Amino acid sequence: MKLKLFFLFILFFSTLAFAQREYARLDNDRGTSMEPILARAEPLIEEIEEDDFEIVRMEFDIISTEKVTYRKLYKDWTYGIVAFGDYRIKDIDVAVYEKVRGKWELFEKDAENDDEAMVSIKPYKDGEHKIEISVFKYNKDYYVGHYGLLILHE
């Protein structure tokens, strides 16, 4: 499973890096359109579904520094969690936390310096997980952008 996820994400990220600049032209004059981030997500969604993965959560929103979301994950599954930014975002990260004795502890993170982040996790137990999306750097003249978050498994 991890190997399959690895190859899926390699294909996904190479496609996104090549096409990122093209998505800027889809935005409106005010820079508020969701079209660029949705266009960026489309090839990934198609690839995920062609490879028989199931998307169990999709989220698209505006972000300046960080957003947090929660999801119950199950120990019987290995999950891929992908966060990606639109043309304005230069560095986005994702971190997954598990609740241990009432406190959130870091389970896995991707802190690479690029506009997409991915982790593959297999929870130790069924339970709620905290997913934190953080933006550390924007492209010149931007301080806000849209992000996409996808959670998937086989």
Predicted regions, residues:
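Non-catalytic, beta-strand-enriched accessory regions in extracellular/secretory proteins
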Residues: D52-Y74, V119
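Hydrophobic beta-strand segments within beta-rich accessory/binding domains
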Residues: V68-K72, W77-G85, K130-I133
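Extended, low-complexity, turn-rich repeat/linker tracts enriched in Gly/Pro/Ser/Thr and Asp/Glu
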Residues: G85-I92, N139-D141
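Short, surface-exposed beta-strand/strand-loop-strand elements in extracellular ectodomains
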Residues: R88-K103
